[in-house]
C-alpha cells in the first residue's frame, strides 16, 4: 500500500492515477523536474550517434520520462524496466505514435540485461520507494549494466540538508503521503552508495524539490 493505493504499484488503477497524483502533489512541476534529467544526457550525447547509444530507464513507471527521451532522440535505443505490468502498459500508451522502446517486466535489482550493455542508465524517482538494502542492490545492478564510461542520471527527492528551508516538509512527507521508506532515504548516503559501486561523481544539483546526481562508471 503505497501513496494510500491498495496494491501499491501493481494495479491498473494505480497506473491510471499515478501521473495525476504526482502532478497534483508537485503543483505541475513533476514534468519540469523530470526534464532536468535531459540536460546531462544532452551533454553526454554531444558528438555521439544516437543510433549507437542504448539508454535503460530503471523503474520506468508510466513512461513519462521515456517519452521525453524519445521526443529528444528519435533514433536512440531505449529500454524500460519496471516491476509492474500495468505501468508498462501505460508506458506503451505514452509511446504510441512514436518509435517504441523495449519494455521489460523485472525488478530493478535483477534486470535481465547483459553486463556492460548500456551507455546511459536513468533512475527517476525510484530510490525513495526502496528499502535501504534494495537501494544498494539496485545501484550495484546499474553499475553492472553500464558500460565503462557510461552515465548514470539519477533524479529523486531532495534529502535532508540539501535545501535546509525545505527540511520540515521532507520530515513530514512520509507520514502525510504514506511513504514507508522515504524517511531513511532522506538521510541515506547516496554519495557513498554510488562511489562504492564504482560510479564516480560528475555533478549534483537540486531542481525545485528534486535532487539530480550524475555519475560515470569508471
State what each model feature region is.
Residues 1-44:
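Conserved Class I S-adenosyl-L-methionine-dependent methyltransferase catalytic core
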Residues 197-218:
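Core SAM-dependent methyltransferase catalytic element
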Residues 136, 153-197, 203-205:
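C-terminal alpha-helical "lid/dimerization" subdomain adjacent to the S-adenosyl-L-methionine
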Residues 136-148:
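A short glycine-rich, Lys/Arg-flanked "PGG" loop and its adjoining helix->strand segment in the class I
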Residues 56, 64-110:
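Class I SAM-dependent methyltransferase SAM/SAH-binding core
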